């Protein structure tokens, strides 16, 4: 996000020194977070590295300004497709990672744990679809449309015309949490707007 913000402001103000700063940040970002398996570490703290596959990395592939090249972005999109994508959004943690808990049920502390350990978040799908479009262009349109259809049934199930906060990370992907969540609706609408730019 810092890299994207620096480049955005540099373009806005015409400040090349900000671009130079962004380029330095980009090199540091890649050296620190890109691992040999082609995806981004979730966090690095000194010598401690979290190899969990989480959706935070999708932002680096989706933003207009990114230190990643196309091949690196594709690696991120591909691992998100394989391990995080559900019909209801991106899981907050891969099922292959330790501590995976896909079910947002039980007392508050249990739900709070599951929230970041495997539930599917619809709003993250917007950034995933944006990154997918940037990699696969026109061939992505049908794939994205099929995924969006999965949200239509939700708009009559919980709160009419809206989408729940989260979904269980495993089938049958039950809607949980708040029955209406503005970020989810906003990202679906933003995705439709992105598709419209392809005259779709």
Report residues per predicted region.
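Short glycine/serine- and small hydrophobic-enriched flexible loop segments
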Residues: 4-11, 62-65, 127-134, 190-194
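Catalytic cores of carbohydrate-active enzymes
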Residues: 1-97, 101-103, 146, 153-185
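Short, flexible coil/linker elements and helix-boundary hinge sites characteristic
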Residues: 14-17, 137, 193, 199
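Terminal, non-catalytic domain-edge segments
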Residues: 182-200
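C-terminal hydrophobic structural anchor segments
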Residues: 131-157
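C-terminal substrate/ligand-recognition segments
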Residues: 99-140, 189-193
